[in-house]
Amino acid sequence: SILCDADLVIVAVPIRLTSMVIRQLKQLPQSCILADVTSVKESPLYEMLKVHPGPVVGLHPMFGPDVTGLVKQTIITCDGRAPDKYHWLLEQFRVWGAKIYPVTAPEHDQAMAMVQVMRHFSTIAYGYHLMTEGADISQLVEMSSPIYRLELIMVGRLFAQDPILYTDIIFANPDNIAMMKRFAYRFLELLEDVEIGDKDAFVTMFNQVADWFGDYAEVFLQESKAMLLKANELKKH
């Protein structure tokens, strides 16, 4: 009843609860915009389209709660229904400084499997490996160059957050399993080159990846230099 006059309803709950919550939204006004902000899109969009006959859009803000404004922040959008009805919402995000990046739900979930799932899974595996190897974290910090310190920061910050959040992201899509298996296969493939001492194969692979990155490799190198300078200024230990 509290939503009977709503113009916009945004579902912002943990991934594992999203579908259940959406299924309760059966009495929204026809003109109400129904949206979600979860990090997977195909399943929520399907549920929203099924429960609500009005305008539907999937949103994925590519930033966390520490961000204080929308300037230069990316919001991915996935059309569900009636984009002309929710156009004003996206325009308002633009007014606040956000960059709107529209894709289909399948494109979104495929990209997130690489951008989020693989990155989180690799980071968790690396942290788990450091722990099981009995690494001295204080010593690693003291002996790290700026770039490796930054990598340790990225690992450590993940383990300072809610494990359920990352578990939900990794476990949300069964297709992620195949992606992680392919990653493990390529890891072992490169390990085999190291084991047999095939440096030529390793260098060939390296150059192939460098060619694939193209101009982005140099762009990322320069961006990382600026980030490292900033990180060094903020260093507390």
PLM segments and residue spans:
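Rossmann-fold NAD(P) dinucleotide-binding segment
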Residues: S1-M48
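Short charge-dense sequence patches
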Residues: S1-I2, A35-Y46, P61-G64, P102-A105, ...
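Short, basic, helix/turn surface patches
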Residues: M20-R23, D84-Q92, G127-I137
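Alpha-helix boundary/capping residues
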Residues: V9, L25, W96, V115-M118
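An accessory alpha-helical subdomain
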Residues: T104-H237
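A general structural signal for well-ordered alpha-helical segments in protein cores
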Residues: A6, T18, Y86, M180, ...
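Rossmann-fold dinucleotide-binding core
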Residues: V40-V103, D109
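Short secondary-structure transition/capping segments
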Residues: A6-L8, G69-L70, M112-Q116
